[in-house]
Swiss-Prot record:
Protein task: Required for spatial organization of the terminus region of the chromosome (Ter macrodomain) during the cell cycle. Prevents early segregation of duplicated Ter macrodomains during cell division. Binds specifically to matS, which is a 13 bp signature motif repeated within the Ter macrodomain.
Gene symbol of the encoding locus: matP
Protein name: Macrodomain Ter protein
Annotated GO CC locations: cytoplasm
GO MF term list: sequence-specific DNA binding
Organism: Yersinia enterocolitica serotype O:8 / biotype 1B (strain NCTC 13174 / 8081)
Xref: Pfam families: MatP, MatP_C
Membership in a protein family: Belongs to the MatP family.
Any single biological process term in GO: regulation of DNA-templated transcription
Subunit structure: Homodimer.
InterPro entries: Arc_rbn_hlx_hlx, MatP, MatP_C, MatP_N, MatP_N_sf
Amino acid sequence: MKYQQLENLESGWKWAYLVKKHREGEAITRHIENSAAQDAVEQLMKLESEPVKVLEWIDTHMNMQLATRMKQTIRARRKRHFNAEHQHTRKKSIDLEFLVWQRLAALARRRGNTLSETVVQLIEDAERKEKYQNQMSSLKQDLQDILGKDV
């Protein structure tokens, strides 16, 4: 496993995930009867600061259809959590107009790169072009100075 599991932290994420799903109207318990489901949800609400009991609640009461989605959500959250610790793996977001994103994505596909790699290449291309223009401008100025002195 690439990322270490932190049981207490992840238990809090699971609790928050289940509460969010409940508030969105999804059935988070495996109970068919409404009163049993409501009792289980009320128990869950009281367990926010008790990670071990949250895990027990999940084993006892959680709707099994949520299990896979919750695992995927927690796995993604764990990855983001550990990647955020290091500057080089931390993700940043930028706002792009849709047409700009579309053109960037098409360029990335043509080059066989990720969006990030394509952006880096575009920046490097622009820097090389700027450096080349500065060199040409300097050479042109030197040439004018030389020709201007001789004439």
